[in-house]
């Protein structure tokens, strides 16, 4: 219970409400700040939660209630001292003391009533409780009974009972009010405005005086328990000091009797009595033995506390020292009331749990330390040119990891050629950047004033310090460790690119940065290469969120790796449809070739990613293989029918020729591969095309002797001859030269803006331009094909069908728009 009560007192301790004169390491500052718990906006929200629902509930920090507490404290001191005296010296109070006693009991009765309306702090949740039922129940089960019985008019009850002696013993219940005095001293010890040594000595003196005062009253009471005719058998009745005798001591002046009893109690407690006052009867001897035994414990308590004061080793002393340092710090930095309340409240809670640390602010939670750092350092960091355009999250991470440092004029902070471990920001003062020449002389490069930084280029570019920094005036700097800075850049890499851009922009007006331009450019190149690898890695792993974050942060999605592969190549081969679509919308070239001549479409077809193939074909992707005929012939020779089917369905020309002018159908016919030959002719392969030796696929089939294959090719030949009545050479050329193009429904100048919102269409190139326009308009959902014209990528108008090559990108616009 004692520990819980002490915890309650620590938490409920009133914040400093008067002017404090606090000594700091940098001089004396006058702390004229009022700490009121309810004046803090954050604590007001927490503390008054539910207060408006109970209008008659009193907050424990209410100033009128605090005044009432001091008023009751005075009565508690009076009652604590007068109760033993009333018990020992009075059998029936005189009229003037009786009236005073009644007034005191009325005051305590009023205090009992008030206790039912005073909110309290819950020791488990640390929230203020305003609910009347909980307040009443808490008081009823704790102090109510003793407080209420203590207010009984025991003097009247004693007289009404016929002066029954046992009734007088109930007076001691009023000593329960001593707890108010004890609680007052506990609060006083934690009040950093009052000298701790003075507070402790005052408390120890009060303990000693109160114990001896109570013992003196009991000593006198024991003497009065014997009738007057036997008073010679008491310590005071038999007492004779010099020529003065204490016979008939009841008639001696009250003050003299009390002084004599107090003298007896004090010399007995100190065990230095000379025997002039001593116990006479058995009851007095028993009490003296008990009292002396108690005095040994009391003496040990007093000596132990005095020793603790001398060595300054108590928890309270350490707590007070820490509070003084904190108040000095908060005063010097002019922290707001809300932040002050959080800091002091947390330190008081740590003291209650006996938690200590030698480093100031180390005990404070990270969230509160972050608030302090943002309040103190954020205005400086925001003005540093190095961080111009950086995100708020990045700057906040920088701010909460800063450390303050002060340097005197003439001090060298960092020297030229040294490895840099810290990044510095100038808050106040002036520094000079110096370069040491080969002959040992120093040349001033620039001056560093407030809101500048140094050590940044060395850390970012991983080079030695290019110049020496020396203090010219008293400087207040903020230091950031290299490792912390590097860790932050690992997470906020896009802000790292912004920092590099800021450095490059500054080189135009800063000669010292111009000299380091090559190092900066090399580092930028390395960073871009690393960023490209990160983008490709995210695409390969299917990390859509990371990929989007990288590209949104400025990474180029068209950057390739060491094999020339773009993120689209990797996403296509892995089958990530969402990433593929996102990269297409970001403008990645769908026909970009890697070092092996493969496009994203080829990678998707090779891996059998049907969904990705559809997306790429819709966007006009093609294979663009330099030796497509040889590749198709090899595929047929391997017998990979599934791969061949995907190639043909994705738009690869089935009439592509190898170096011997052989088509894939030639190979299939010569090997007797019926299924693959059927697949090729269904895709439009020509049966009448001839190789360098003049052989057609049908000739190869006849040499192979596969009757089923021969019949298939003869039927196809007859069908092709009936459909195309022109010469076989023209038919062969038409089949071999079959081409396709991609038509987009917007102007070439709008390509970048419209690409992510409008899609084109891939169509076969017909025999004339009019058919192409009509077909494209129909596929694009345009109304009248005759009212449109086709433009090339360089905005030139297409006037003839022969101007269009295979894979050409065209742009369809209105004829009226073209004329304007």
Curated annotation (Swiss-Prot):
The chain crosses the membrane at residues 70-90, 98-118, 142-162, 169-189, 204-224, 286-306. Induction: Up-regulated under drought, salt stress and cold conditions. Induced by abscisic acid (ABA) treatment in roots and shoots but not in guard cells. Its main location: membrane. Residues 91-97, 163-168, 225-259, 280-285 are extracellular. Keywords: ANK repeat, Ion channel, Ion transport, Membrane, Potassium, Potassium channel, Potassium transport, Repeat, Transmembrane, Transmembrane helix, Transport, Voltage-gated channel. GO terms for cellular component: monoatomic ion channel complex; nucleus. Coiled coil: none annotated. ANK repeats lie at residues 528-559, 563-592, 596-625, 627-656, 660-689, 693-722. Signal peptide: none annotated. It comes from the Eukaryota. Residues 260-279 dip into the membrane without crossing it. SUPFAM superfamilies: Ankyrin repeat (SSF48403), cAMP-binding domain-like (SSF51206), Voltage-gated potassium channels (SSF81324). GO terms for biological process: monoatomic ion transport; response to abscisic acid; response to calcium ion; response to cold; response to jasmonic acid; response to water deprivation. Belongs to the potassium channel family. Plant (TC 1.A.1.4) subfamily. Major selective outward-rectifying potassium channel of the guard cell membrane. Involved in regulation of stomatal movements according to the water status. Assuming opened or closed conformations in response to the voltage difference across the membrane, the channel is activated by depolarization. Conductance of the channel is modulated in a potassium-dependent fashion. May interact with the cytoskeleton or with regulatory proteins. The potassium channel is probably composed of a homo- or heterotetrameric complex of pore-forming subunits. This is Potassium channel GORK. It comes from Arabidopsis thaliana (Mouse-ear cress). The gene is GORK.
